[in-house]
Curated annotation (Swiss-Prot):
Belongs to the jacalin lectin family. It comes from Castanea crenata (Japanese chestnut). The modification N-acetylmethionine is found at residue 1. This is Agglutinin. PROSITE patterns: JACALIN_LECTIN.
């Protein structure tokens, strides 16, 4: 089974969950219905034999709204970036605008109205091969699936999405993220300052033994600590623990205030200040094989995927 990164979701919590991913081939077209926001999106894909496949329409009809179509010259041209904005429309948080970019530098959009909270994701050598989201009468939320190239690259990405492990623990702000699961965790990179965890970035190991670096989950603040480096043949994570609570100067906004990592060999941390509500992952025999959580300006929440012995 091919490995790919799950990116997002961005948007509201209305509507029903949906998912569309290309198994063989690539995305060759999209149809977007939009006006004051995004009413719906439809995908078209093709393979090397010219067989075409259309997704269902994700969203409503958008009666009277404008329809735009995107055509890509796959396999020479493929999607590498998605961006947009999220805001309220008719008392519902939805995708208000959306844009796409390809490996050729061509930009499509923005479609809809550029207003509200921005979001964006751009691959570093990967290919967007599908999307997931929420929709009802409008496009409530959207995320993407990114395929990992077959060539070796020490900054590329993730694995197949899986059911959630324990957690996440923390606040409810920011955007949801999920790295998936991996054979091993190689390094942990933390950004800490002002008694709060600003961000985390994880270096995993692929099934081929190659390092795969996750996106940076969190904001640009904080100072980087020395990376936690694990000798994967001998050392593995078994548990995380920490504290979360309101961030000073941010009212009731909650984020991770402290985090500690436990391996079968050692304890790393605590990093940050042990203030607020304590949490810990399972102490049952097993190992951590991935992380998920929420992030924005800070690392709002974190959880783990476990492989139990």
């Amino acid at each position: 089974m091919e490995e790919f990164l799950t990116v997002g979701l961005w948007g509201g919590e209305g509507g029903d969950r949906w998912s569309f991913v290309v198994n063989n081939g690539g995305i060759i077209g999209m149809e977007i219905v939009h006006a004051n926001g995004i009413a719906s999106i439809t995908f078209k894909c093709g393979d090397e034999y010219g067989v075409l496949q259309h997704s269902r329409k994700f969203g409503g009809t958008g009666e009277g709204w404008k329809t735009d179509k995107i055509s890509l010259n796959w396999p020479e041209e493929y999607l590498t970036s998605i961006s947009g904005t999220v805001a309220d429309l008719w008392q519902h948080i939805i995708i208000r605008s959306i844009s796409f970019k390809t490996n050729k530098g061509t930009e499509y959009g923005p479609y809809g109205v550029v207003t509200g909270q921005p979001f964006s994701y751009s691959t570093e050598g990967g290919v967007i091969v599908g999307f997931h989201g929420r929709s009802g009468t409008l496009l409530d939320a959207i995320g993407a699936y990114v395929k990992i190239p077959q060539k070796k690259d020490n900054t590329l990405k993730m694995a197949l999405p899986v059911p959630r492990g324990p957690g996440p623990w923390g606040g409810h702000g920011g955007m949801e993220w999920d790295d998936g699961v991996f054979p091993a965790i190689r390094e942990l990179h933390l950004y800490v300052g002002d008694s709060v965890i600003h961000a985390i970035r994880v270096s995993y190991q692929s099934k081929d033994g190659e390092p795969l670096l996750s996106p940076k989950h969190g904001g640009e603040g904080g100072e980087p600590i020395d990376p936690i480096k694990l000798e994967v043949s001998k050392e593995f994570l078994i548990r995380i623990a920490g504290f979360y609570g309101p961030v000073e100067g941010s009212g009731s906004f909650k984020a991770l205030r402290s985090i500690t990592f436990y391996t079968n060999k050692a304890k790393y941390g605590p990093y940050g200040d042990e203030i607020g509500q304590a949490f810990t992952s399972s102490v049952a025999p097993g190992r951590v094989v991935g992380f998920h959580g929420r992030s924005g300006a800070y690392l709002d929440a974190i959880g783990v995927h476990m492989e139990y012995f």
